[in-house]
A protein has these predicted regions:
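Outer-membrane beta-barrel pore domains
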Residues: 2-185
């Protein structure tokens, strides 16, 4: 059916609330419907934790010009000082903080792909033919390698220090590498 449909947008900012710069993103107009799928894994063994998630989205648009996105992350954590066991919280569907005065080490990797090459080629052809297109210049791939330390003073107070190496490659823009150091209480 012809007519006005919804716009669906995906945006990923860099890892700070101070700088609101969008690292990669896409807004798709004339979206008719969207399918989403996600699978998550949470593994605990004593003082080690492994978490991962995969997500995928398919957006059907007018004239069959669909768009696909996907991504995943994986993180491994371990309590290295005052090792205590991680405990799964069934009510909150997550892992409780470790006991008092524990030091945790974290390694992680995340990947986001907003870059659908087939849709990009069709979009460029449509624009060249004088048909309406969408701005895909900021649609791209983003990866994040992270290392962190968390000190759990008690159940309510945690000190965190994280380092992230973020790489962003959008369709029409230069590749960017960004180093982020975060300290949080």
């Amino acid at each position: 059916s012809k007519g006005k449909h919804a716009a669906i947008g995906y945006n990923k900012r860099y890892l700070t609330v101070v700088d609101k710069t969008v690292a990669t993103g896409v807004t798709l107009t004339d979206a008719r419907w969207e399918n989403k799928f996600t699978a998550e894994f949470q593994g605990l063994y004593r003082n080690f934790q492994l978490s991962s998630q995969y997500y995928w989205s398919h957006i059907a648009r007018e004239v069959g010009n669909s768009y696909n996105t996907d991504g995943f992350y994986v993180s491994a954590r371990g309590i290295v000082v005052n090792p205590g066991n991680y405990k799964y919280n069934f009510a909150g569907s997550g892992v409780d903080n470790p006991d008092n005065k524990n030091l945790e080490v974290m390694l992680g990797y995340g990947y986001l792909n907003l870059r659908d090459g087939d849709a990009y080629a069709k979009n460029k052809a449509a624009i060249a033919a004088g048909l309406p297109g969408v701005d895909l210049s900021k649609a791209g791939r983003m990866s994040d390698v992270s290392v962190g330390l968390s000190y759990f003073l008690n159940k309510y107070v945690t000190f965190r220090l994280n380092y992230h190496f973020v790489t962003v490659k959008n369709f029409d823009l230069e590749k960017k590498n960004v180093n982020v150091l975060q300290a949080r209480v």
